[in-house]
C-alpha cells in the first residue's frame, strides 16, 4: 500500500470511473500542509488566487481553519456543507495524481456497503495539522474575506459590460 505523509492513499480505480466521482459531486477534498511547497502567506495566497482552493473551518472545539478544493461558484472563504468540486471534469479529476489534495488521495473507493468512499485522512486531522499555520490562515481569511479571485473579478466586469451594452 502506498502512503503519503504517513496516510494510506489509493489511486483512482475503474470503480471511480464507473461512479463518475460521486464523492467529488458532494464534497471536495481537503489539502494537507504537506500538499504545498510554500506555506507562507504569499505562497498560499498565490495558490488560492488560482481559483481552485477555498478556506474552510472546523466548527467543533477546538476550532480551526484548513484549505480544501472549492465548490463551483463559491466564495474563497466558505464553511462547507457540500458542493461540486471545481476539479471535477466529465472524465474525472482534472488534477494529476501529484496535484490532488491528500484528502482525495486518501479515499478508498467503495469502502462501505452503501458504495461510499472512505478516507484515511479526516477533516479533523487536516484541521489539526493546519493549526501550526493558523496565523497565516487567519491573515488569508482577513485578506480574502468575501473577495473573488482576479479571474472572477474580470469575468464579473465583462458580464456587467455585456449587460450594459445590451440595454
Language-model features, listed with the residues they occupy:
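Short loop/turn segments that flank or connect secondary-structure elements
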Residues: 1-167
Amino acid at each position: 500500500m502506498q502512503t503519503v505523509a504517513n496516510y494510506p492513499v489509493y489511486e483512482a480505480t475503474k470503480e471511480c470511473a464507473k461512479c463518475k466521482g460521486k464523492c467529488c459531486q458532494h464534497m471536495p477534498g481537503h489539502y494537507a500542509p504537506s500538499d504545498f511547497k510554500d506555506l507562507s502567506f504569499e505562497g498560499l495566497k498565490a495558490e488560492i488566487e488560482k481559483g481552485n482552493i477555498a478556506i474552510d473551518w472546523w466548527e467543533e472545539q477546538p476550532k480551526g481553519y484548513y484549505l480544501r478544493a472549492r465548490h463551483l461558484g463559491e466564495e474563497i472563504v466558505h464553511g462547507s456543507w457540500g458542493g461540486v468540486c471545481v476539479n471535477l471534469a466529465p472524465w474525472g479529476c482534472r488534477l494529476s495524481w501529484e496535484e490532488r489534495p491528500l484528502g482525495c488521495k486518501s479515499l478508498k473507493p467503495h469502502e462501505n456497503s452503501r458504495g461510499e468512499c472512505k478516507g484515511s485522512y479526516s477533516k479533523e486531522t487536516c484541521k489539526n495539522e493546519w493549526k501550526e499555520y493558523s496565523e497565516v490562515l487567519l491573515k488569508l481569511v482577513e485578506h480574502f474575506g468575501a473577495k473573488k479571485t482576479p479571474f472572477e473579478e474580470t469575468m464579473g466586469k465583462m458580464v456587467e459590460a455585456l449587460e450594459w451594452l445590451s440595454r
